[in-house]
Amino acid sequence: MLKSVIENVHALEIFDSRGNPTVEVHVTLSNGVVGKAEVPSGASTGENEAVELRDGGSRLGGKGVSKAVNNVNTEINDALKGMDPYDQAKIDQTMIDLDGTPNKGRLGANAILGVSMATAVAAANDNHQPLYRYLGGIDLEMPQTFHNVINGGEHADNGIDIQEFMITPIAKTSFRDGFEKIVNVYHTLKKVLEDMGYETGLGDEGGFAPNMKNSEEALKALHESIIKAGYKPGEDIGIACDCAASYFYNKEDGKYHLEGKVLNDEELADYYDKLLDEFPELMSMEDPYDENDVDGMVKFTKSHKDRIQIVLDDFICTNPALLKKAIKEGAGNASLIKLNQIGTVTETLETIRMSRKNGYNTMISHRSGETGDTFIADLAVAINGGQLKTGAPARSERVEKYNRLLEIEEELGKGERLAFFPDDIDHD
């Protein structure tokens, strides 16, 4: 039996959850098997992220992706035709070489990633395997999920500077049971916010976007909601934050402008300590310092790495070279993994492997501009015992991922998943 090869690569312009254009790619093999992928996009982006190719001009506010689509349908299609879909690394490297830039800016990371993801899906389909099995092998575990239920920063139009307030199930249990707890807290939170006199409109990621005065008020609302839903903060449900500190860091004075205060590195650490003391269920912080504030991040890691999970997002941008540098410097103890920050499946998996090898936890992440694509749900299972954040249990583009995880758990027949506990954080 002849091995199937790539016969055609085709892209089209579709729209994401914020009504912005994005790229959908179909990779068709010589035996008729097809793999499809849809590319997400972010509202808050790190300086070192791979570059999305946008059209500019007046059409669709300059955000059209017809150039990226055309690059897939011409150059990339011609280059990949006849290649082995199972050789993911070779396919991805072919596109990187074809692009010829350090940030995938000529062809567009949105074009390259769409093809990379769709190729993996096509190979899995051709091999009659679910994607998580194709990417991950045999011994698999369900991920621990983090749910953004109060939105601030770049994700909402309110007075909260910290970007995300998340809840996570931490009792060792099935994914379904943990997710049901999250849903209960989410609906309880809506009532708590209404009782506090706040609007309960939703942000980009399905979380509420109340016009609160500060982060402490948001954490109090979460703490109260966990208890009112019948759970114990820090035992059943934990809290995590994406500080996204680059967005309240002022480059001119080198200070953090947070909730009416102007803070240096040490004062910002004191601010975080106050939150950690008041809310011991707060167990994970993402990007607590600016992506270029190496001293601040390293000092905070040294003093807090055994107390909380410190997740690097903008600091590493899912880039193996930047992660290697962060590890050498002693920054963080967990890596956030976003496919479109680096632009290929191969480089994403390399970053995950490097993280694990060096004792860093790994958290797979969605973007604020999402689609119904569930690739990241399968990826989170494939990496075995990782973490996943993909928004609140609301808005279909978020819930699609959680429903996919429910399907996977059913297929695996797993009654229990690996859970993250704060006591596990020790990377000395």
From Swiss-Prot:
CDD domains given in the database record: enolase (cd03313)
Location of the active site: 205 (proton donor), 338 (proton acceptor)
Residues annotated as binding Mg(2+): 242, 286, 313
Localization (cell): Cytoplasm; Secreted; Cell surface
GO biological process: glycolytic process
Entry GO terms, CC: cell surface; extracellular region; phosphopyruvate hydratase complex
Cofactor comment text: Binds a second Mg(2+) ion via substrate during catalysis.
The protein's annotated pathway: Carbohydrate degradation; glycolysis; pyruvate from D-glyceraldehyde 3-phosphate: step 4/5
Classification via PANTHER family: ENOLASE (PTHR11902:SF1)
Protein name: Enolase
Organism, scientific name: Lactobacillus helveticus (strain DPC 4571)
